[in-house]
Amino acid sequence: WDNLHFGDPNPYASLPTMNIYTYDLGRLLHEFIDEDVAFNFREFFRVNDEETFVHEKDVWAFLNLLTKEDKESCYPFANEEYRNIFRHTLWMVPGVKEARALSTMLQRHPVFQHFKIVNVAGDGDRDEESRDALVAVEEAIGRDPDATRTITLSCGRLTTGVSVKAWTAVFMLSGSYNTAASSYMQTIFRVQTPATINGRVKEQCY
């Protein structure tokens, strides 16, 4: 900005720096590679008539992978430092049934059970009262984001026109090799909202 607009105020200066990371899940979970030689989230998260995962053991292994301490790969929930960075996140999943099944599994996981799971996909979890998605997320985060931990599950809601200041990351667990980059970008910018929380300026997002 300074090179092209020297002397002019930078309108983007207050935005947190966007960091984009990718994981090669196909290298770890070979059976979910599709014809484009890319990882297929829709198949990976496929549910049966009882709304449980067809590949439940693999999904459970994936959640364990996210929380596995690995110095080389730096999985996002591998230690307390990372869990504090990703205290409030948005997870994009393929569909409503998949979100319900994942919500149930997260609530049983030894690490993720300490996060409040907010399912805003469709009408949310069956045992939860239907309400405005943004209100549900903000209530779960509460007045002090440092005192809570949340994971918001969505397959489309809250991806345009809203801002949740406490969100620091979005996990894209949907789409495929052929998904347009523009659809990803529109979603990930939800976490680039400027914020000052308990005196700390949000400088990074993921």
Where are the model-predicted features located?
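Generic beta-sheet signal
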Residues: 87-91, 149-152
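Interdomain helical connector at the RecA1-RecA2 junction of SF1/SF2 helicase-like NTPases
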Residues: 1-89
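Conserved RecA-like P-loop NTPase helicase motor core
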Residues: 116-206
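N-terminal cationic-hydrophobic initiation segments that often serve targeting/anchoring roles
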Residues: 67, 81, 107, 142-145, ...
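Short, well-ordered amphipathic alpha-helices
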Residues: 59-77, 100-107, 137-138, 169, ...
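"Short basic amphipathic alpha-helical interaction patches in structured regions
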Residues: 35-43, 52, 92, 103-107, ...
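Conserved helicase motor "Helicase C" RecA-like lobe of SF1/SF2 P-loop NTPases
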Residues: 85, 94-121
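Short, conserved catalytic or adaptor-binding loops enriched in Gly and charged residues
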Residues: 8-13, 108-112, 199-200
